[in-house]
Amino acid sequence: MEVDLPVHNEYDASRFHQVTIRDPIAGADSTFTIPTRYVNLSFLNAGAQGTVVMADDLVTTQRVAIKKMQQPFVMTMSAKRAYREFILLTTIKHPNIIRLLNAFTPDTSLSTFREVYLVMELMTHNLHEVIHRLRLDHKTLSFFVYQSLCAIKHLHNSGVIHRDLKPSNIVVNDRCVLKVLDFGLARKKNVDTSMRMSDYVVTRYYRAPEVILGLPYSEKVDIWSVGCIFAEMINHTVLFPGKDRIDQWTKIYSVLGTPDDHFISQLGQSAAMYVRSLPRHQARAFSEIVPDTNFLPETENPRVHLTPHVARDLLFNMLKINPEERYSVEDALNHPYVKLWFKDDEVNAPASENRYDQEIDFADKTLIEWKELIFNEVQRYQADHDIFTG
């Protein structure tokens, strides 16, 4: 539904208009105050971080996605996430990372500032929808994993760990081009990760063992997440569907087996005692975890290593409980199952400039201070870009 509403006096009515969009899932309305270049809005999806619509851009004549950040200034945590996502989207650039086309606020002063909008390239589906609607052939499985790895390699080279990879944060189009989005939980690689991550609320199913058990973590948490997503693409079900943190660990070790003493010795005292108190499990064979019957046999191509056996070998090395034994992103990109797609300009693209200040993750800022930081960044973006006709 598209309805023009009276424009708030704070907005420039010659440049902005208001459109109310109905969320058919939640049964709620959301009002978008956007430049007049964007018309024909329709609901795309909604989540904890915001509402996303499709729109026509009259300037570029392209269809775009517009995300209205969901109440970014209600809590400190949501404001921090909004700031982090805004900075990273404006700086990280790679073919497999969603591209920011425009960003703006209709609010003209800090005192009235309450809305932030991000305009991005439109992708037709998220990976969650694809996984649960289609059986994917080997070529598509391989291509999706390759592109996911290219995206996280670029993030890692740019000093960023995504930390929240999951099917709903990955989008694809009808040409099977894949892009990663949602950087609200991303963090710089070289911060102190030995402390517990108070704001690390990545979807539990894709959470690495070292995070669950309170160990320091590295960029290999992203490899674990891609491995879980890869298995889900094959099986069409979540690999480790834990009900809570403890059950998540139970699901993992009951499939992959009890870790060795070297790994357990690295845990804190209480975590080590807990892990040792559990019944020991032998690892299940990966031929049981992702059986041949879950692949499309007619799409195998042994000449380029597109077989269940080779796919399982990649998965086996991505889903190591001990991150020291787990594949790096470079290891994974050189694996036969995905190497057929290797393009140097995709795999080794120059690192993006990263203006995100790692120290700000630990800064004790008030909600008003976070709001001012975001306002200043949006104003900077608007000063550097023509948001109305550029």
From Swiss-Prot:
Requisite cofactors: Mg(2+)
Reaction(s) catalysed (UniProt annotation): L-seryl-[protein] + ATP = O-phospho-L-seryl-[protein] + ADP + H(+); L-threonyl-[protein] + ATP = O-phospho-L-threonyl-[protein] + ADP + H(+)
MF GO annotations: ATP binding; DEAD/H-box RNA helicase binding; JUN kinase activity; protein kinase activity; protein serine kinase activity; protein serine/threonine kinase activity; RNA polymerase II-specific DNA-binding transcription factor binding
Disruption phenotype: Temperature-sensitive sterility in both hermaphrodites and males which, in hermaphrodites, is associated with disorganized gonads and with impaired production of endomitotic oocytes, likely due to a defect in oocyte maturation which often results in vulva protrusion. Both hermaphrodites and males produce sperm but it is defective. In addition, the formation of P granules is disrupted in later stage of oogenesis and the protein levels of glh-1, a component of the P granules, are increased. Old adults are bloated and move more slowly.
Alphabetical list of PANTHER family matching this protein: MITOGEN-ACTIVATED PROTEIN KINASE
Family: Belongs to the protein kinase superfamily. CMGC Ser/Thr protein kinase family. MAP kinase subfamily.
Name recorded for this polypeptide: GLH-binding kinase 1
Species of provenance: Caenorhabditis elegans
Gene coding for it: kgb-1
